[in-house]
């Protein structure tokens, strides 16, 4: 399955998240992420095969903290997640050398609710009628712009996936161009064994239909979890496939810009099934020397130069490096309790090769990852150099022994929690407003055991202890000081609400009560296992490790999830200060 060295050389949890939401880290001027009121980014199209929208996309609205923390009258500005938010407006600032080549300016416009454009043709050509060739079957998934159906070729009986994009949802000329470009790129990359194959594109009066091969073998992480074990050698094989796809894209002038494990699916459940790269909704064509400014991607995987709004194809190598780091350790290299914190870590954080399981990982593997995650894109390894690295080569030095079992456990939690949040994100519509504050008030009361209206350090310690957080006193004190804006020595109700609302803003202003009510179908005030299973079934998500989710989220062990526990889960990025604990 792997690629050889060939090709062109193109140069824990619970209340921890509730409190640490108030951590607004200082930034040095040259490393800060400049905010823009109207800028944000999102994935334009739903997953092309399984119909899942990607969650947790990067937006460019990241506000650095001041050097001191005055008492604000309103919550800090939000960091919005891109897959449900409007695309970025054009970048007008240009601080480059005027003699340098112009930067790519994608004319994204803020999406407004409308009946859509009067579109004569998206594809620019007359096509056959989809239903004359295919029988359209059950829905596989629903996305922001399109719905994915199973379709069957009437002549051969072969199954495919068909993504149908309603024209009325294409509200700007840029939306139309995005659809055209994605189809063009899929055709451009057609023939590569590890790129999803487009079969055809069709258009009628109301929609565009993109027919492609169906990938029914599940996501990359899920396959690893199902097998129960894998070796460093297998990780190297997967790395070759991932980087080989990137090299092929770059050699054809395509930058993916949204590489992450969820965008790699297996064609079938067979042991030797091909791994395919999917979803080119954020991909663009690029020319040598061309730079881009729009902030796109997903938080854990986004490259630092993307956050700084000056990047090119090297950003894909960084994302691949993050994926390989996760394949070897089970956790992402840069994480925090908030998305802004994740961005800070991407820009400045240190790589951890000390914690388990890294002592048992080969030095060659660590060398490769380290060189793929160099922040200076010009010093970062190229795809060709990665494929030629001793660890990544087909006959390379990757160890043929099982990786630490903790890796599998961490991958399982990481994958499962993301999927549940995906469902919740899909069903959120309008603002929680009053309902959201009511939920936070109950959370505050739960920690403020003496009902004084202030959370003391001792109450915070006990609250964290109740949910099993394993933190040093110095770390808890650090959280306390970060949330205590007026330096009173306690966290008052206003500070707590400000911190929590800020975190909800980071979650795309998620209206959590709406999502909770979706799961709580009988209105009991609790989400049961059966309700979770039914919701997952409705969204086509099988084997989502429901028992693991309940164990992680159900803090009082009553076998169900109440609203407070649900809020904790939604605000948890998955990794506490000490990493995921494995029993």
Curated annotation (Swiss-Prot):
<dbReference type="GO" id="GO:0005524">
    <property type="term" value="F:ATP binding"/>
</dbReference>
<comment type="function">
    <text>May play a role in signal transduction pathways that involve calcium as a second messenger.</text>
</comment>
<feature type="domain" description="EF-hand 4">
    <location>
        <begin position="545"/>
        <end position="576"/>
    </location>
</feature>
<feature type="binding site">
    <location>
        <position position="486"/>
    </location>
    <ligand>
        <name>Ca(2+) 2</name>
    </ligand>
</feature>
<keyword id="KW-0519">Myristate</keyword>
<feature type="binding site">
    <location>
        <position position="484"/>
    </location>
    <ligand>
        <name>Ca(2+) 2</name>
    </ligand>
</feature>
<dbReference type="GO" id="GO:0016020">
    <property type="term" value="C:membrane"/>
</dbReference>
<feature type="compositionally biased region" description="Polar residues">
    <location>
        <begin position="51"/>
        <end position="62"/>
    </location>
</feature>
<feature type="domain" description="EF-hand 3">
    <location>
        <begin position="507"/>
        <end position="542"/>
    </location>
</feature>
<dbReference type="InterPro" id="IPR002048">
    <property type="entry name" value="EF_hand_dom"/>
</dbReference>
<feature type="binding site">
    <location>
        <position position="495"/>
    </location>
    <ligand>
        <name>Ca(2+) 2</name>
    </ligand>
</feature>
<dbReference type="InterPro" id="IPR011992">
    <property type="entry name" value="EF-hand-dom_pair"/>
</dbReference>
<dbReference type="InterPro" id="IPR008271">
    <property type="entry name" value="Ser/Thr_kinase_AS"/>
</dbReference>
<feature type="binding site">
    <location>
        <position position="531"/>
    </location>
    <ligand>
        <name>Ca(2+) 3</name>
    </ligand>
</feature>
<feature type="binding site">
    <location>
        <position position="558"/>
    </location>
    <ligand>
        <name>Ca(2+) 4</name>
    </ligand>
</feature>
<protein>
    <recommendedName>
        <fullName>Calcium-dependent protein kinase 20</fullName>
        <ecNumber>2.7.11.1</ecNumber>
    </recommendedName>
</protein>
<feature type="binding site">
    <location>
        <position position="556"/>
    </location>
    <ligand>
        <name>Ca(2+) 4</name>
    </ligand>
</feature>
<dbReference type="InterPro" id="IPR000719">
    <property type="entry name" value="Prot_kinase_dom"/>
</dbReference>
<feature type="binding site">
    <location>
        <position position="526"/>
    </location>
    <ligand>
        <name>Ca(2+) 3</name>
    </ligand>
</feature>
<feature type="binding site">
    <location>
        <position position="459"/>
    </location>
    <ligand>
        <name>Ca(2+) 1</name>
    </ligand>
</feature>
<dbReference type="Pfam" id="PF13499">
    <property type="entry name" value="EF-hand_7"/>
</dbReference>
<feature type="binding site">
    <location>
        <position position="522"/>
    </location>
    <ligand>
        <name>Ca(2+) 3</name>
    </ligand>
</feature>
<feature type="binding site">
    <location>
        <begin position="140"/>
        <end position="148"/>
    </location>
    <ligand>
        <name>ATP</name>
    </ligand>
</feature>
<dbReference type="InterPro" id="IPR018247">
    <property type="entry name" value="EF_Hand_1_Ca_BS"/>
</dbReference>
<keyword id="KW-0677">Repeat</keyword>
<feature type="binding site">
    <location>
        <position position="565"/>
    </location>
    <ligand>
        <name>Ca(2+) 4</name>
    </ligand>
</feature>
<keyword id="KW-0106">Calcium</keyword>
<feature type="binding site">
    <location>
        <position position="452"/>
    </location>
    <ligand>
        <name>Ca(2+) 1</name>
    </ligand>
</feature>
<feature type="domain" description="EF-hand 1">
    <location>
        <begin position="435"/>
        <end position="470"/>
    </location>
</feature>
<keyword id="KW-0067">ATP-binding</keyword>
<feature type="binding site">
    <location>
        <position position="490"/>
    </location>
    <ligand>
        <name>Ca(2+) 2</name>
    </ligand>
</feature>
<feature type="compositionally biased region" description="Pro residues">
    <location>
        <begin position="67"/>
        <end position="79"/>
    </location>
</feature>
<keyword id="KW-0723">Serine/threonine-protein kinase</keyword>
<feature type="compositionally biased region" description="Basic and acidic residues">
    <location>
        <begin position="27"/>
        <end position="50"/>
    </location>
</feature>
<keyword id="KW-0479">Metal-binding</keyword>
<feature type="domain" description="Protein kinase">
    <location>
        <begin position="134"/>
        <end position="392"/>
    </location>
</feature>
<dbReference type="InterPro" id="IPR011009">
    <property type="entry name" value="Kinase-like_dom_sf"/>
</dbReference>
<dbReference type="GO" id="GO:0005509">
    <property type="term" value="F:calcium ion binding"/>
</dbReference>
<feature type="binding site">
    <location>
        <position position="488"/>
    </location>
    <ligand>
        <name>Ca(2+) 2</name>
    </ligand>
</feature>
<feature type="compositionally biased region" description="Basic and acidic residues">
    <location>
        <begin position="82"/>
        <end position="106"/>
    </location>
</feature>
<dbReference type="GO" id="GO:0106310">
    <property type="term" value="F:protein serine kinase activity"/>
</dbReference>
<feature type="modified residue" description="Phosphoserine">
    <location>
        <position position="298"/>
    </location>
</feature>
């Amino acid at each position: 399955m792997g690629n050889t060295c060939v090709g062109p050389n193109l140069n824990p949890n619970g209340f921890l998240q509730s409190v640490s939401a108030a951590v607004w880290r200082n930034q040095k001027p040259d490393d800060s992420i400049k905010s823009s009121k109207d800028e944000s980014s999102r994935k334009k199209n739903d997953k092309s095969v399984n119909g899942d929208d990607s969650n947790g996309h990067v937006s460019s609205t990241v506000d650095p903290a001041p050097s001191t923390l005055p008492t604000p009258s309103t919550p800090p500005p939000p960091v919005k997640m891109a897959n449900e938010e409007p695309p970025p407006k054009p970048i007008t600032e240009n601080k480059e050398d005027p003699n340098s080549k112009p930067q790519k300016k994608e004319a994204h416009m803020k999406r407004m609710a409308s009946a859509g454009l009067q579109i004569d043709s998206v594809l620019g050509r007359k096509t056959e009628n989809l239903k004359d060739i295919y029988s359209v079957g059950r829905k596989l998934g629903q996305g922001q712009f399109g719905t994915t159906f199973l379709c069957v070729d009437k002549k051969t009986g072969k199954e495919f996936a068909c993504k149908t994009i309603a024209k009325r949802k294409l509200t700007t000329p840029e939306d139309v161009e995005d659809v055209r470009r994605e189809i063009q790129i899929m055709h451009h990359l057609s023939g590569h064994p590890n790129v999803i194959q487009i079969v055809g594109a069709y258009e009628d009066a109301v929609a565009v239909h993109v027919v492609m091969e169906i990938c029914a073998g599940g996501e990359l992480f899920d396959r690893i979890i199902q097998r129960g074990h894998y070796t460093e050698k297998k990780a190297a094989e997967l790395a070759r496939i991932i980087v080989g796809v990137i090299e092929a894209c770059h050699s054809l002038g395509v930058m993916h810009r949204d590489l992450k494990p969820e965008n790699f699916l297996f064609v079938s459940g067979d042991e030797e099934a091909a791994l395919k790269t999917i979803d080119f909704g954020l991909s663009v064509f690029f020319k040598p020397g061309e730079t881009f400014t729009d902030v796109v991607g997903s938080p854990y995987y986004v490259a630092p130069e993307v956050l700084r709004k000056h990047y090119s194809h090297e950003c894909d190598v960084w994302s691949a490096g993050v994926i390989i780091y996760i394949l070897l350790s089970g956790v992402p290299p840069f994480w925090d309790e908030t998305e802004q914190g994740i961005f800070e870590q991407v820009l400045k954080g240190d790589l951890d090769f000390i914690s388990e399981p890294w002592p048992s990982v080969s030095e060659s593997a660590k060398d490769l990852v380290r060189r793929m995650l160099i922040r200076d894109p010009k010093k970062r390894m190229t795809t060709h150099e990665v494929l030629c690295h001793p660890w990544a080569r087909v006959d390379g030095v990757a160890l043929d022994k099982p990786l630490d079992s903790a890796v599998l456990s961490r991958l399982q939690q990481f994958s499962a929690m993301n999927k549940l949040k995906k469902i919740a994100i899909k069903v959120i519509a309008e603002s929680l407003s009053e309902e959201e504050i009511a939920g936070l008030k109950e959370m505050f009361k739960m920690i403020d055991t003496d009902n004084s209206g202030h959370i003391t350090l001792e109450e915070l310690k006990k609250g964290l202890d109740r949910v099993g957080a394993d933190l040093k006193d110095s770390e808890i004190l650090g959280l306390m000081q970060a949330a205590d804006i007026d330096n009173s020595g306690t966290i008052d109700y206003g500070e707590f609400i400000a911190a929590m609302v800020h975190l909800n803003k980071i979650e795309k202003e998620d209206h959590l009560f709406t999502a909770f009510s979706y799961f709580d179908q009988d209105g009991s005030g609790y989400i049961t296992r059966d309700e979770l299973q039914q919701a997952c079934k409705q969204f086509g998500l099988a084997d989502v490790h429901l028992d693991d989710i309940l164990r992680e989220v159900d803090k009082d062990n009553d076998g169900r999830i109440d609203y407070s526990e649900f809020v904790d889960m939604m605000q948890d990025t998955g990794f506490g200060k000490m990493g995921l604990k494995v029993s």
